[in-house]
Swiss-Prot record:
Region annotation Coil 1B: where it falls in the sequence: 138-281
Similarity comment text for this entry: Belongs to the intermediate filament family.
Origin superkingdom: Eukaryota
Protein name: Lamin-1
Length: 646
């Protein structure tokens, strides 16, 4: 077979050389060279089969085809001898070869046109796939934007609820402060009522009623505060649950989007590879089928069978390579795709469940808002009741304060009248003693009675020289008993010695250069100022200074302190905790007043000018007819309340 093939090749080459020389000599164009046809066929085969092994097999196939084209098979060369070819047969063969070459070139052009069409179609498919992918991406972005808007809406709602909560807490604190102020004022009222218990026993029922109302207000406030705390706790729990659901939903959506994008990318990649391989195999098969269909005769049957077998081998080899290279990957991708589909289904179910939960939470949030609105409405009603109760209490406090001021003024008037009456009584008793003594002396002188009858009295009584007695009240010094007796009786008493009881009181001297004066000083307890004019006086930065044996003490008024017309301000010592402190007529000093027996109290204005002074001395006793009324240093110089130990 090899020798026959070699002889056929030699005969073919000699025939080709003779035909070429004849065509050149006759002026006929020579057909294209065999290498050119082979290179074109090899280019087509390379486009159809990209691998090196396929290229090698295609070269072998084309070589066999070129042998078939130029000289036919070995059987044809054996059937025809070199001497049997005539010139006409060679021309006919060359014409057939030219026709075949033209057909092959036309087919090649058709294949290139089809290739361009397939490329355009591939570009269109890619654009459609990209548009679909962009559409899906846009949908997921829209869904994500809606989710973000929902999260923003929930966040804004949360911020509004927090602001409402802060506002409610602020209002609650304000009401607490108002409640504390009201309670403080009620305590002050209670202290004032206790201080004036002796003079205002009929006000006990009013005070008991106020205490009961205060207890009711406290109970209602505690109940409302507890309900508000419960509702706030429920609202916080609902907010936390909504936040957790939103976070889990966002995570699930992100995971779903990532898995779908990855699966689509890998599927597209594998589909493109499969399409390229299918296109290559289809192109080669198509070329071989068309080439085979156009050949006829026994000359090409063997070459067609060889080419078909070569193509089958190439296809099997390509299929094996594809199975070997992409089989495992396709299986893995299918498994991964199934798992991702399951994951996506699970995420969709979780997303649906989270949406249902969010709807439930929104419903619950609406219910909680309704409850909060009801609680706020109830709280508003309670606040209105509390404000009304506060107004009523304020009106009652004002009425009781007015009544207390009236009672205090009446008490001051009665006390002043009592002091005046007591002073006049002392003077009258002193004068009566003097008149009795003069009468007894006159009876002895006239002999109506003997001196022995008055001896015991004369020797038993204390003989003292008649002196003046000072009894100075906070409202000014009064004339002495001696001057009054001198006014009533001008009879000189020089020879007779009058036995009388001397009344000694604390010598309290009050001086003032303006309408505001120091009314009373109780050592260690209180300093009272009085405005005797009808106008309101400013006491801003005025100063009260005390000087005694134990040291000094001072108090300065606030810049907005005033004293009304015909009114009194009491400045209590800091040790007097039970005393009222309303900031208007009763003030607690920042320091303790001195408790010395001898005190000098000075009232000065903001520039340091002395406006009033008050001196206290505690040498105070009252002894009339062996009935002594001794004032302890505690009651000495206390003025209005000194006689009652208040």
């Amino acid at each position: 077979m090899a020798e026959k093939a070699g002889e056929a090749g030699v005969q073919t080459r000699s025939r080709r050389n003779r035909s070429t020389s004849r065509e050149v000599s006759n002026g006929v164009a020579a057909p294209p060279a065999k290498a050119t046809r082979s290179s074109q066929l090899e280019a087509v085969a390379e486009q159809a089969t990209p691998s090196s092994q396929q290229s090698q097999k295609s070269v072998r196939t084309e070589s066999s085809m070129s042998l078939g084209f130029n000289g036919g098979s070995s059987q044809g060369s054996r059937a025809t001898s070199p001497t049997s070819f005539s010139r006409a047969q060679e021309k006919e063969e060359l014409q057939n070869l030219n026709d075949r070459l033209a057909k092959i070139l036309n087919k090649l052009n058709d294949s290139e046109e089809e290739n361009r069409t397939l490329k355009i179609r591939l570009t269109t498919v890619q654009q459609e796939t990209s548009a679909d992918l962009n559409d899906q991406i846009g949908k997921y972005r829209d869904e994500l934007e809606r989710a973000r808007k929902a999260v923003d809406a929930i966040t804004q709602e949360k911020d509004r609820e927090l602001l409402a909560k802060d506002k409610a807490l602020g209002e609650l604190n304000e009401h607490k402060a108002q409640f504390a102020a009201l309670r403080k004022r009620l305590d002050e009222l209670e202290a004032r009522l206790k201080a004036a218990e002796k003079a205002a026993r009929d006000k006990d029922n009013v005070l008991t009623e106020l205490k009961a109302q205060l207890a009711e207000s406290e109970t209602a406030g505690k109940r409302i505060q507890k309900e508000l705390a419960d509702k706030t706790k429920q609202l916080d729990q609902a907010r936390n649950q909504i936040e957790q659901e939103v976070i889990s939903r966002t995570n699930l959506e992100n995971a779903l989007k990532t898995a779908e994008e990855k699966a689509k990318f890998e599927n597209n990649l594998l589909e493109s590879k499969l399409q390229r391989q299918s296109l290559s195999v289809t192109t080669v098969d198509h070329h071989s089928a068309q080439s085979t269909s156009r050949r006829s005769g026994s000359d090409f049957s063997a070459s067609v069978e060889d080419m078909r077998s070569a193509l089958e081998d190439a296809r099997e080899e390509i299929q094996e390579n594809m199975d070997r290279m992409y089989g495992s990957k396709l299986e893995g991708l299918e498994v991964l795709s199934e798992s991702q589909k399951q994951t996506i289904n699970g995420l969709n179910q979780a997303l649906t469940a989270s949406r249902h939960d969010m709807k439930d939470l929104q419903k619950e949030n609406q219910q909680l808002r309704k409850k909060v609105g009801e609680v706020e409405k109830e709280l508003h009603q309670q606040h209105q009741k509390f404000d009304q109760h506060k107004m009523d209490c304020t009106a009652r406090i004002a009425a009781l304060s007015d009544q207390s001021n009236q009672a205090s003024q009446q008490y001051q008037a009665l006390l002043e009248e009592y002091r005046t009456t007591t002073h006049n009584n002392v003077e009258m008793r002193t004068e009566l003693e003097m008149y009795n003594k003069l009468l007894s002396d006159e009876e002895i002188r006239l002999g109506i009675t003997s001196a022995d009858q008055y001896g015991g009295v004369r020797h038993g009584a204390k003989k003292r020289k008649l002196t003046e007695t000072f009894y100075t009240t906070p409202f000014g010094s009064r004339s002495s008993a001696g001057s009054r007796s001198a006014g009533h009786n001008s009879t000189p008493v020089t020879k007779s010695q009058v036995t009388r009881t001397t009344v000694k009181t604390s010598e309290n001297k009050s001086k003032a250069s303006g309408p505001v004066r120091i009314l009373e000083v109780a050592p260690g307890k209180v300093v009272r100022l009085e405005n005797i004019s009808e106008a309101v006086m400013q006491l801003g930065h005025w100063r009260i200074h005390q000087h005694g044996a134990s040291g000094d003490a001072a108090f300065q008024f606030e810049k907005d302190q005033v004293i009304g017309g015909q009114s009194i301000i009491s400045v209590y010592s800091s040790t007097e905790d039970s005393q009222p402190n309303n900031g208007v007529t009763e003030i607690i000093a920042t320091n303790a007043w001195l408790a010395d027996s001898h005190l000098e109290t000075v009232l000065s204005d903001g520039d340091g000018n002395q406006m009033a002074t008050y001196e206290v001395s505690a040498d105070s006793n009252l002894d009339i007819h062996n009935d002594s009324v001794r004032d302890s240093p505690r009651s000495a110089g206390k003025g209005i309340l000194g006689f009652f130990g208040l």
